Curated annotation (Swiss-Prot):
Annotated compartments: Cytoplasm
CC cofactor: Zn(2+)
Superkingdom classification of source: Bacteria
EC numbers for this chain: 3.1.-.-
Protein task: Single strand-specific metallo-endoribonuclease involved in late-stage 70S ribosome quality control and in maturation of the 3' terminus of the 16S rRNA.
GO cellular component terms listed in the entry, alphabetical order: cytoplasm
Residues reported to bind Zn(2+): H113, H117, H123
Source species of the chain: Borrelia turicatae (strain 91E135)
Protein name (Swiss-Prot/TrEMBL): Endoribonuclease YbeY
Database matches in Gene3D superfamilies: Metalloproteases ('zincins'), catalytic domain
Length: 148
């Protein structure tokens, strides 16, 4: 059924750091003890993610990251992944300026965020001090962060 499979590609954007990004994702999966995964990550532009956001979430606007989980959700944290992450690099360019961080930091943060959603974490707010998922996200980022 599930194996160790990680696929990366781009839609409408240029990205030059595939090897570093691939190894970063593997380090996140390892840190979170995820041994079984079929994960595809698409780096895209705002137009691409907006179409998906409209189709699947009925929100006609771009967003930073979308996660699509193909495993049956149990309501508990699962350490298996079968899903897709869609991340808008164009959106992250703006948010990295807004938060005064490097683009690769924002990419890594959003990748971790999407992976946490795929294994069952949720959050109701963006409170980095009190939301368990966001606290874990920042811990994982501190432990696995790479410079591209």
């Amino acid at each position: 059924m599930i194996k160790e499979e990680l696929n990366l590609w781009a839609e409408g954007v240029e990205f030059k750091h595939w090897d570093a990004y691939y190894n970063f994702i593997l380090s996140v999966l390892d840190f979170l003890c995820i041994k079984e995964y079929e994960l595809s990550v698409i780096l895209c532009n705002n137009e691409y993610i907006q179409k998906l956001n409209s189709q699947f979430r009925q929100k006609s606007e771009p967003t930073d990251v979308l996660s699509f989980n193909y495993l049956e959700e149990s309501g508990q944290i699962d350490h298996k992944i079968q899903g897709d992450l869609i991340i808008s690099l164009e959106y992250l360019e703006f948010s990295s300026l807004e938060f005064n961080v490097e683009l690769y930091d924002e990419l890594q943060r959003n990748t971790i965020h999407g992976i946490l959603h795929l294994i069952g974490y949720t959050h109701k707010t963006n409170d980095f001090q009190n939301e368990e998922m966001l606290i874990i996200q920042e811990k994982v980022l501190r432990e696995t962060r790479r410079v591209f």
